Amino acid sequence: MKKVLLALGLGVSTLMSVNSFAADLQEGKQYVQVSQQASQQKEVIEFFSFYCPHCYAFEMEYKIPQQVVDALPKDVKFKQYHVNFLGHQSENLTRAWALAMALGAESKVKSPLFEAAQKDALKSMDDIRAIFLSNGITAEQFDGGINSFAVNGLVNKQVNAAEQFKVRGVPDFYVNGKFRVNPEGLNYDDFVKDYVQTVKGLLQK
């Protein structure tokens, strides 16, 4: 019984802590409101580019996306959408990322795609294909899926979402389709923790 009460106490304490943080968030500082209406589904969307050095740091060094995922309630979806406006293979990478999402293979190809893009080693879709094949995706899966109806739909979803939110720079996080995290307003000395807490707080607003 003591353990149950302790667990309940911790749960209430955590909820109060998150709600308190949400109340302390200031529009124009930690976040910007981009819509009057929240999305029907609770979600966090990160827009990124494999060519973006800051996205690389977010993903590979500070692991902010994974820390956000680990902190999210179970009923909140986390999505990563690739943008088309950085790098000469950006459109091919958006399509390849759509294929990775369709196959549930994001974790297999994300790191090698980041590494290759940062080294400017991607000259064509063939180079992207080679990375997929070297990381557990079969030729049949890649060739049969890259221009499939499902992948075309996921490409359009990424492009349309970036246009809807008027994304001009990355990495860029949006919470419930209503709020954009403003990294310039976060605590520089404790940036990663503040970023994650801001996302959690915005989910409560």
From Swiss-Prot:
Pfam family name, one: DSBA
Disulfide bond annotation, renumbered to this chain: 52-55
Main location (coarse class): periplasm
Cellular compartments per GO CC: outer membrane-bounded periplasmic space
Ranges of residues in domain Thioredoxin: 23-201
GO BP terms: cellular response to antibiotic
GO molecular function: protein disulfide isomerase activity; protein-disulfide reductase activity
Matching InterPro entries: DSBA-like_thioredoxin_dom, DsbA/DsbL, Thiol_disulfide_DsbA, Thioredoxin-like_sf, Thioredoxin_CS, Thioredoxin_domain
Signal peptide: 1-22
The keyword Disulfide bond is annotated on this UniProt entry: yes
Compartments, as annotated in UniProt: Periplasm
Xref: Gene3D superfamilies: Glutaredoxin (3.40.30.10)
Entry keyword set: Disulfide bond, Periplasm, Redox-active center, Signal
Cited SUPFAM superfamilies: Thioredoxin-like (SSF52833)
Similarity annotation: Belongs to the thioredoxin family. DsbA subfamily.
Matching NCBIfam families: ThlDiSintDsbAHaem
Function: Involved in disulfide-bond formation. Required for HI transformation. Acts by transferring its disulfide bond to other proteins.
PANTHER family per record: THIOL:DISULFIDE INTERCHANGE PROTEIN DSBA
Protein name as it appears in the record: Thiol:disulfide interchange protein DsbA
